[in-house]
A protein has these predicted regions:
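Alpha-helical transmembrane segments of multi-pass membrane proteins predominantly involved
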Residues: 1-342
């Protein structure tokens, strides 16, 4: 109910912003919107107010602070199978909308929406990572860490189209897309393990429920550990390279502000890593709390899928060029009609 009510409110914000966008430009076609803004024929005051509502609605849907209040409760309260979907599919959809709407349609307003996204990124990094380390519920911890991951991803948008440079736009958007895909894979793995454990007679909710998992199911413990290491950004995982690409994009414009943002992102990543490494410690070094652990009777397909996704975290971490090129090509195709890339 909370997700439905707040999600409806966010949709209202987004639709209200889009209606203002139409009122300011007279069109809902993104190329025409961009042309209207570039030619200064759009009504500026209405356009800026609409932009505020659009960014607020997108931030709410994404789960970026300070529009995050629904995320921990929904992740904890929903069945793990539903949480798995919420952690992946909506994030990819909202990311695609952000690319199309902000970058393709409102690129000329980049200084304005970049400032808004920078505030969202800083709030998400601070609130998400600091809150994650204090959680004892596994799904709630992953929810708070998701907020922190959203903040890291948004940092790439802060430097997109810096000084009108379309190459920096391509690199920044590709870095953010790569980051979102790497997070999605890790989230699918982590929530997939929790879902597998939860369906065997008890609900895997607390971190203590993972105690000693390595003793009776080392495969699942190993896959979960890979997911946590990737989310923490440990080298040789895709999460490390994703964070590196975002920081590299951020520092292509080495201003004092961008350097400060990079330092904040690194510090908050170290703080957030404590939450991820604590799960690994619980799985590998704590004794099982249950004298009779639930028998994990997973089919071959489930085991193969989890193993494949876990392997992707390593493969794309060691050989990231293929996935990164796909991201860059997707961005080039999106921007070709207005930037001449490719």
């Amino acid at each position: 109910m909370k997700y439905f009510i707040l999600g409806s409110l966010a949709s209202g914000f987004l639709l209200y912003g889009l209606s203002m966008l139409y009122g300011a430009t007279g069109s809902m076609l993104l190329p025409e919107v961009l042309q209207s803004v570039m030619q200064h024929t759009a009504k500026r005051d209405i356009l800026m107010l609409g932009l505020v509502f659009i960014v607020a609605g997108l931030a709410f849907k994404l789960g970026a602070a300070p529009f995050h209040m629904w995320l921990p409760d929904v992740y904890q309260g929903a069945p793990t199978s539903i949480t798995l979907i919420l952690a992946a599919a909506p994030k990819l959809a909202i990311f695609a909308v952000m690319l199309r709407l902000l970058v393709t349609g409102l690129l000329e307003l980049a200084p304005q929406w970049q400032l808004m996204l920078m505030v969202l990124a800083v709030c998400s990094l601070l609130i998400g990572n600091l809150s994650a380390v204090m959680q004892s519920n596994a799904k709630r911890m992953l929810a708070w860490s998701t907020i922190g991951q959203n903040g890291f991803m948004l940092l790439a948008f802060v430097v997109s189209h810096a000084n009108g440079n379309n190459l920096s736009l391509k690199d920044a958007c590709a870095a953010s897309m790569f980051y979102m895909l790497s997070y999605t894979i890790a989230a699918l793995v982590s929530f997939g393990i929790l879902m597998l454990l939860s369906r065997e007679g008890y609900e895997c909710e607390n971190l203590s429920d993972l105690s000693g998992l390595n003793h009776h199911r080392p495969l699942y413990a190993g896959i979960m550990a890979l997911s946590m290491l990737s989310l923490a950004g440990v080298p040789l995982t895709v999460g490390f390279y994703a964070k590196f690409k975002v920081l590299h994009a951020l520092l292509t414009v080495p201003t004092t502000l961008h350097i400060a943002l990079a330092v904040l992102a690194i510090v908050m990543s170290v703080v957030g890593a404590f939450a991820y490494l604590r799960i690994i410690k619980i799985m590998f070094f704590d004794a099982p709390e249950h004298t009779q652990p639930a028998a994990l009777q997973a089919g071959y397909g489930v085991r193969a899928t989890l193993t494949f996704n876990g392997a992707l975290l390593l493969v794309f971490g060691i050989l990231p060029a293929g996935l990164l090129q796909l991201c860059e090509q997707a961005i080039i195709n999106m921007l070709r009609h207005m930037s001449g890339l490719g």
